[in-house]
Amino acid sequence: MAPDVAWLLVLPLVFRPTLVTGITIQTAIKNFRTLHVDYPMVNYPKGFHGYCNGLMAYVRGKLQDWYCPKIHYVVHAPLEDIQKFCKYSESFCENYNEYCTLTQNSFPVTICTLVHQQAPTSCSYNSTLTNQRLYLLCSRKHDAEPIGIIGLY
């Protein structure tokens, strides 16, 4: 009976890293959908002083972080159009420890750039709307989901 009890104590230690990794990936997938895809594009009230200021207030609230990100990319296209590029990501980006890919198509993207470092409660952003290809981080090598945007091309 003692060996059975020992296995019950050891199994959570063996399986916990897998569960934590799975939860982290699921959170990254959800965050990509909610923080990097805005389709159709939302119009923020005038009090936000521009699209990026409204969006970044939302982003900081969702991340529950006072830190002002220096740059943030938002794609204005259906999620399905973006997802298909992570179905076969053959490249591994060692700097990010994730699979990555460059989209074949250009997408409408808003680049939110921090004007300058300010007090955490008063982040101010410039908006640049462009049409470019995306460098995506993907959740795995095949049949993956996008989990981040690491740049534009």
UniProtKB/Swiss-Prot annotation:
Please give an example of a GO cellular component term from this record: extracellular region
Q: Which residues cross the membrane?
A: none
The UniProt entry lists the main location of this chain as secreted
Q: Where is the signal peptide?
A: 1-22
Record's keyword terms, sorted: Secreted, Signal
Q: Note the SUPFAM superfamilies from the entry.
A: RNase A-like
Keyword Signal, does the record have it?
A: yes
Q: Name one Pfam family in it.
A: RnaseA
Judging by the UniProt lineage, the source's domain of life is Eukaryota
UniProt GO MF annotations: nucleic acid binding
Location(s) in or outside the cell? Secreted
Q: Which InterPro entries match?
A: RNaseA, RNaseA-like_dom_sf, RNaseA_domain
The entry sums up its family as follows:
Belongs to the pancreatic ribonuclease family.
What function is annotated for this protein?
Does not exhibit any ribonuclease activity.
Q: What is this protein called?
A: Probable inactive ribonuclease-like protein 13
Organism of origin is Mus musculus
